Amino acid sequence: MNYGTVKFFNDSKGFGFVKDNESGKDYFVHVTGLIDKIKENDEVTFEIKEGNKGPNAVNVKLA
């Protein structure tokens, strides 16, 4: 499990980015990968899953 911070999330478009606290990497997150509703600067936990265009944050929930 990874811990991070929501950098950006657009509710109307259904996607955003989460920054991993340990590695500093940004991961794409799609609305289908959410467990909880998120907004910018929320602290979250997530898993990383390989997607069509690289790694994505999935099972994203508030920490």
Model regions and ranges:
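OB-fold/S1-family single-stranded nucleic acid-binding modules
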Residues: 49-63
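Structural detector for short beta-strands of small beta-barrel domains
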Residues: 1-8
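Short nucleic-acid-contacting surface segments enriched for D/E, G, S/T with interspersed K/R
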Residues: 34-45
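Beta-strand/loop nucleic-acid-binding surfaces
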Residues: 25-36
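Short aromatic-glycine-enriched beta-strand elements
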Residues: 13-18
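Well-ordered beta-strand positions in beta-sheet-rich domains
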Residues: 3, 26-28, 43
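A generic beta-sheet turn/junction motif
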Residues: 10, 22, 50-52
